[in-house]
């Protein structure tokens, strides 16, 4: 084994150790002081399995949307690759502050599969736009069905809810501009080129950068011509978010909240999610828990609310974090490279 291979092996082992440590730390922080074992023992296992299956389908739906956009750009990816990108998004979002590592992690695995950065970036932005549109639609739907109660909440964090709505709308507008407005996309490309100049351009760097921008614009043009692709992505995102919100319903039933119906949970979770999901706050998790207690105060008995919240967090975050991490390791053992058809 030569020196380069040994160095690569050691770096890989170190990275795996760091990621494993980060995963253990996040799980410890989530479950510290909580009796998750006792909660699971007292829960109906079939409803818990339903919650786990919902999150598994959530990951598959995410992978399907990524594969749709890549297929439009001329790539043929396997189911394993599709799931690897999905797992990377969830895993790195979960272990990084403010969920900033999701897209970079996905770009890394796409680059390993020889996908062009321009096509990968466009694909992830489209998937994000689809998800945001579906989340806002369901959030507005939930707020309307609850007669606008989300805007009438009182308390220390009441201000975050209307701000959350506004931020999500702003994100959608920004994504639309970056994806489909040539001038704004060109503006960001110019910024990127200037940053490269500061670091020092090598021969051919400018040409490669402009070529990547042209490929990005070509992918955007193809999506405009194939609007049905984005419509399918939007429908998939709606199903994906509904599955995610259904986890709370399954967990509530598992704990014994037999009087709580699925539609009530859907509209409540939709309003809560759209309110706090895009807030760039260090204590966003605390805000979510406060909102959870506030939204469900009249829906779930006080003595069961803590157990439902804990079980929901375990099924919607902790288990998927472990599963996505293991999935990444297993699916990266024998990676298969896709081939792009667009230059």
Q: Can you name each region flagged by the protein language model?
A:
Residues 198-216:
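Short, membrane-interfacial amphipathic segments enriched in basic
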């Amino acid at each position: 084994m030569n020196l380069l291979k040994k160095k690569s092996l050691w770096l890989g082992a170190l990275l795996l150790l760091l990621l494993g440590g980060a995963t253990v730390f996040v799980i410890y922080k989530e479950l510290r002081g909580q009796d998750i074992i006792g909660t699971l023992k007292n829960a109906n296992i079939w409803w818990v399995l339903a919650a786990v299956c919902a999150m598994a389908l959530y990951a598959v739906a995410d992978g399907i949307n990524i594969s749709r956009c890549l297929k439009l750009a001329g790539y043929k990816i396997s189911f394993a690759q599709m799931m690897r990108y999905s797992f990377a998004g969830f895993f790195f979002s979960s272990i990084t502050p403010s969920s900033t590592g999701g897209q970079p992690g996905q770009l890394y695995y796409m680059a390993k599969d020889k996908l062009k950065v321009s096509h990968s970036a466009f694909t992830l932005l489209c998937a994000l736009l689809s998800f945001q549109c579906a989340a806002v639609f369901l959030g507005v739907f939930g707020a309307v069905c609850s007669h606008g109660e989300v805007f009438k909440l009182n308390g220390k964090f009441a201000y975050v809810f209307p701000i959350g709505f506004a931020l999500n709308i702003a994100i959608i507008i920004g994504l639309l501009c970056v994806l489909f407005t040539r001038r704004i996309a060109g503006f960001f490309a110019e910024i990127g080129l200037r940053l490269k100049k500061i670091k020092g351009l090598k021969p051919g760097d400018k040409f490669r950068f402009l070529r990547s921008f042209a490929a990005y614009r070509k992918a955007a043009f193809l999506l405009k011509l194939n609007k049905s692709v984005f419509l399918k992505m939007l429908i998939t995102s709606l199903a994906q978010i509904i599955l995610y919100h259904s986890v709370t319903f399954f967990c509530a039933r598992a704990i014994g909240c037999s009087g709580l119906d699925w539609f009530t949970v859907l509209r409540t979770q939709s309003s809560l999610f759209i309110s706090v999901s895009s807030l760039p706050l260090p204590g966003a998790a605390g805000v979510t828990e406060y909102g959870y207690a506030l939204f469900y105060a009249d829906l779930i008995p006080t003595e069961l609310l803590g157990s439902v919240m804990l079980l929901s967090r375990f099924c919607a975050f902790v288990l998927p974090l472990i599963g996505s991490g293991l999935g990444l390791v297993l699916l990266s053992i024998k990676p298969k490279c896709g081939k792009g058809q667009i230059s």
